[in-house]
Design a protein with these regions (language model features):
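A compositional/biophysical signature of low hydrophobicity enriched in polar/charged and small residues
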Residues: 1-179
Length: 179
């Protein structure tokens, strides 16, 4: 878990270039030093990097690096996964589905959340503020498969509006946090 505290930019007397590893959009990272952040950045790029290679990159002994990696894994790393290329597995269509409902009670949310969570093609699911209440990211083979998923979604719970947009091109996709 990141522990952030507000920092007064006038209070920091060190040049920004020296502070850049600990300043994130006006917040001071109290829990991680510059070496921790370098380790986390490297692991975000490739979580399979050997500790010896990581230690050489960061400028630490292998043992010191291993201890830091272990601590960071325990405190900050949610999970390590392989990120697959959807197109290589036949998922040629990415749909973003905006959902609006007139229901805003716990029972409806539980029903809708559980139902959506059972649909494997829904790879991301968010509750929103603004014009729509929920946003789904769906990966499917084509429009025919999307229509099948759409029909499953609208059967889960009462919805007042469902609007779909299809990605024409993926320009940027990353799981790395901007630390």
């Amino acid at each position: 878990m990141l522990i952030l505290g507000k920092i007064n930019p006038n209070f920091c007397k060190i040049q920004f270039i020296l502070c850049r590893n600990i300043l994130i959009k006006g917040y001071f990272m109290q829990k991680y030093d510059a070496k921790d952040l370098r380790i986390l950045r490297a692991l975000q790029r490739d979580s399979t990097t050997a500790v010896a290679d990581l230690a050489a990159q960061i400028g630490l002994s292998v043992n010191a690096c291993w201890r830091r990696v272990k601590r960071l894994q325990d405190e900050s790393i949610d999970r390590q996964v392989a990120i697959l290329q959807p197109e290589q597995f036949g998922f040629g269509l990415t749909a973003f589905v905006s959902v609006r409902t007139n229901e805003h009670n716990d029972k409806w949310l539980k029903t809708f959340s559980e139902g959506i969570s059972k649909i494997d093609e829904v790879v991301e699911f968010y509750r929103l503020s603004g014009q729509y209440d929920y946003l789904l990211k769906i990966l499917v083979k084509d429009v025919v498969d999307y229509d099948l998923v759409y029909k499953r979604i609208i059967k889960i719970a009462p919805l007042s509006d469902v609007s779909s947009s299809f990605a024409m091109e993926r320009i940027k996709s990353t799981t790395a946090l901007p630390i």
